A protein has these predicted regions:
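Short Ser/Thr-interspersed hydrophobic loop/turn segments at strand-loop and sheet-helix junctions
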Residues: 51, 75-79, 170, 187-191, ...
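Alpha-helical interface subdomain recognition
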Residues: 1-85, 101-106, 113, 117-118, ...
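A short, charged helix-loop
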Residues: 208-236
């Protein structure tokens, strides 16, 4: 398998890297995390003008016909500067579902403005009792004339505090954990009966708590077929997990770079602590884990576009496990090698540490993905 980037991909990576270095270094993230939205519409528009929002969408949907590897390359660079714009929420999750299931009218109204950087989107799927089980949904959508009435609550909605519209998971039939009966609806942020509350996160990003109290949606706001959304939800969350691995890769690499630089500068007993062999071994092990995460991230990005559900699920679950296990080794050792200053807000190490920790838990933690991986067909035979 050829992992070499095309010339177009190399140019794109260089452009995103220059953008992060010049226009969105970590100092900008420090400023943005104290604002109401946590990101800037003008920067979102710049990203759209550069083609980074539309790169992986089909040309007939307003995109450039790229693939998920292109998306991952962008996210890896954005992770270096902790760029706060809602790329995963808008582009990967909600945008991906619209591209997969949307009618021409829905694409024109919701996807096109987002790809142009004029709006942002969010995917509201998680509920308090759900953990990581995608079929666990108590939000109900009942028939109301030619449309539907939505009632329920959604938690941890990425970009939910700032989005212009939502893709909402609601149950149109069945019990709360049935695999069938789940549907997707397009809901405007200003819809009567919809209340959203901003919830600050430990990583400096905010999410939204959505309360739907009799939200009326027209029949043309149903995204895809009624009662058959589970496969698309799983597909979207898998791509979200692959995207989390890609963003975290940029952050892990930066964490390693910061740590190695500190080992060269910090002196003890009259010499740089990086000259001590024991710490060199520790840094070497950190490098190995970062590279393992990168290899698994690349495979997950490739398989995110696979039509084979087994290949997609196995590659992405494996990458997510490596991110949590190998990534944690990098995180804890960066803190230990820096010492107490690493956990202060003034030190960038702590900001990367917290963001990676959030990404490790998004879309399934290591325990959940290990469980899914071991349950996939062929696992027992492969182990034997």
């Amino acid at each position: 398998m050829n992992f070499e980037l095309t010339e177009e991909q190399k140019m794109m990576v260089d452009a995103v890297k220059r953008f992060v270095d010049k226009d969105s270094p970590i100092t900008r993230f420090r400023q943005m995390r104290t604002t109401e939205t946590g990101w800037e519409p003008k920067v979102w528009k710049t990203m759209a003008d550069n083609g980074w929002l539309a790169v992986s969408f089909p040309e007939d949907h307003g995109g450039y016909g790229g693939n998920f590897v292109d998306t991952s390359l962008i996210l890896e660079q954005l992770g270096r500067g902790l760029v706060p714009e809602p790329y995963i929420a808008s582009v990967v999750l909600a945008g991906g579902l619209l591209s997969r299931l949307g009618t021409p009218a829905q694409l024109e109204k919701f996807l096109a403005p987002m790809l142009e950087g004029r709006t942002s989107l969010a995917f509201a799927y998680a509920e308090r009792q759900g953990r990581y089980e995608t079929s666990d949904c108590e939000t109900a959508a009942t028939k109301s004339g030619a449309g539907y009435t939505l009632r329920g609550e959604k938690v941890w909605v990425l970009n939910g505090h700032a989005a212009d519209a939502f893709v909402v998971v609601a149950r149109t039939s069945g019990a709360s954990r049935d695999a069938s009966g789940l549907s997707l609806f397009l809901v405007d942020a200003d819809a009567p009966g919809l209340k959203r509350i901003r919830v600050p996160g430990m990583d400096g990003h905010s999410t939204g708590l959505l309360k739907l109290d009799g939200v009326e949606v027209a029949g043309d706001r149903l995204l895809g077929e009624e009662g058959s959304a589970l496969a698309s939800i799983e597909w979207a969350l898998d791509r979200g997990a692959a995207a989390a691995c890609a963003e975290a890769q940029g952050e892990l690499q930066t964490l390693l770079t910061l740590t190695v630089e500190y080992l060269k500068q910090r002196k003890q007993f009259g010499k740089a602590i990086g000259s001590f062999q024991a710490l060199q071994h520790r840094a070497s092990d950190m490098f190995a884990e970062v590279e393992l995460c990168k290899g698994m991230m690349i495979l997950a990005a490739i398989q995110a576009d696979s039509a084979n559900d087994l290949e997609r699920k196995s590659a992405i679950s494996a990458a997510k496990v490596q991110l949590q296990q190998g990534g944690w080794y990098v995180q804890e050792n960066s803190v230990q090698l820096f010492g107490g200053i690493a956990i202060t807000d003034e030190q960038d190490v702590g900001l990367y540490f917290k963001r990676i920790r959030v990404l490790q838990g998004l879309f399934g933690d290591a325990d959940w993905h290990l469980g899914r991986y071991s349950s996939l067909p062929g696992f027992e035979g492969a182990a034997a």
